[in-house]
Amino acid sequence: MPPKIDDYFIRPAAEDDVDALFHICLVTADAGADASALYSNPRLPGYVWAVPYLKFAPEFAFVLAKHDRVVGYVVGTPDTASFDKALGRDWWPVVRREIAGLVPSTEKDADVLERIANPHSGTPGLEETYPAHLHINILPEAQSGGWGRLMIKTMLNELSSHGVPAVHLGVSPANERAKGFYRHLGFEELSHGDHLAFVMRLDKPAI
């Protein structure tokens, strides 16, 4: 695990971090910018892109903290297909009960509610060649100092230690900063239909 630097440190995520994951996911959900005004329910993005990983793949969930405050996370799964099956069985039914009666009032509401009602991959077809996937989000205050790189490296090391051969992740085409970040780390960019993905083989890691 990376050392503490300037009071920041990376640690395994814990159940007590759930609220922080919901919050960070929301305030970075607009192509890296704050999406608070785009959702009527602030937990909607986290239901999809953050919290289920802590619940169903806790070995692959890490947070960046400053003192006792969580300021970023990286979450993932070594086996996308198995993870999706577990969510279909044990996660989405719970979420649907929690948001029962919620009527979408924004375009983003509608997008996430559709995804919850009919779960689907944002990068379809990649899981056969690149079975793992991940998500990372960091608050603006902690986006310098190389912490994003260290968090990705922490995740890739964990995946590699479990024999995972390759990983993929989806990126909003509008998020130019994220695209530059992944290119710099050695990920390969793939246009996959209407989706943009970055992939890496873990038998020859670039970082």
Segments (PLM) and residue ranges:
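Conserved N-terminal entry element of GNAT/NAT acetyltransferase domains
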Residues: M1-D16, K204-I207
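Conserved GNAT-fold acetyl-CoA-binding loop/helix
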Residues: A29-W49, A86-R96
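Conserved catalytic-core motifs of GNAT/GCN5-like acyltransferases
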Residues: A81, H168-V171, K179, R183, ...
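Conserved acyl-donor/pantetheine-binding loop and adjacent beta-alpha core of acyl/acetyltransferases
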Residues: A81-H135
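Conserved GNAT acetyl-CoA-binding A-motif
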Residues: Y130-A132, L159-V171
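Conserved acetyl-CoA-binding loop-helix of GNAT-fold acetyltransferases
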Residues: H135, S144-E158, G180-H184
